[in-house]
């Protein structure tokens, strides 16, 4: 691991389940490069992709990710 890389909770959960990054990439339908960048803290995801990873790992999304993208509340909400 390079000094600029950090280990994330996503990677911890993946490794604790004995899964390869390729298996999670395929199962969550997320490109392997994207998943790698997420795991080292280089990239954020929109909520739908984060949810795919959380669902595949069977972990609540809030245990893996901080909300970083927000949508304006519509008047009908």
Spans of features found by a protein language model:
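Residue-level signal for the short linker/turn that defines the boundary of a DNA-recognition helix
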Residues: 8, 18-19, 45-48
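DNA major-groove recognition helix of helix-turn-helix/homeodomain DNA-binding modules
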Residues: 29, 48-63
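Short, charged recognition helix plus adjacent turn
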Residues: 13, 55, 63-77
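A short, Lys/Arg-rich alpha-helix, primarily the initiator
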Residues: 1-17
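Short alpha-helical DNA-recognition segment
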Residues: 18-37
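Residue-level detection of the helix-turn-helix DNA-binding "recognition helix"
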Residues: 15, 29, 40-42, 69
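A detector for short, charged/polar N-terminal pre-domain segments
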Residues: 1-5, 36, 69-75
């Amino acid at each position: 691991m390079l000094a600029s890389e950090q280990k994330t909770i996503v990677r911890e959960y993946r490794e604790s389940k004995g899964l390869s990054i390729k298996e999670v990439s395929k199962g969550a339908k997320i490109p392997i490069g994207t998943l790698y960048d997420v795991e080292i803290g280089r990239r954020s995801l929109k909520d739908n992709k984060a949810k795919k990873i959380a669902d595949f790992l069977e972990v609540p999304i809030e245990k893996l990710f901080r909300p970083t993208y927000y949508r304006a509340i519509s008047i009908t909400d």
